[in-house]
Amino acid sequence: MNTTRRITATALATAALVAPSALAATAVATPGKPAEPTKPAKTVKAQTKQLLKDIAGKDKRLDRLSTSTAVEALADDTEAEVVGNVTDARADLADLRTTVEAADSTVDTRAARKELHSFRVENFRIVVNLVRKVEGLEEAAAADPEAVTHLAAAEAAALEITATSTKADLRDVRDHLKAAQAELGATTA
């Protein structure tokens, strides 16, 4: 009885494996029907679609930031520099979008994904906050030349930050700001 079941199960499994390949062979060999065109790999198309969505999202965030009240509240010259940096970042994103649209392999999309991953929109938000702190301390630091030097260095370093700047670059700006605050704390104490 068990032998019969095993033989039957083997026959069914073999038929299940052979039937689809036999149908596929007859489908290709059918005369009169044109062969189906080859489609690009679905993974590349899906990766490209997701990359384009991610790029559009980052571009939208940059657009909102450039017209935000936080940026508009900065001093005019500082605001112009921050908006210029954001505009440059948006141009870089447009170049990346063109690269992604032209990508035809997984290697290309991986390289674009890596470049997009290193693109940090939040750097600009951090820059705005740091510059606002610098502007808030400038009046109190007017009498202390050492603090003024640190604040000027912090503002200059902050305005050099781009979307691809590292966290170490941001840390340098914060260190200048902390040094200025420490200098102000030492003079008032």
Question: Where do the protein language model's features map onto the residues?
Answer:
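Secretory targeting and sorting signals
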Residues: 1-29
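Mature extracytoplasmic/periplasmic regions of secreted or cell-envelope proteins
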Residues: 24-189
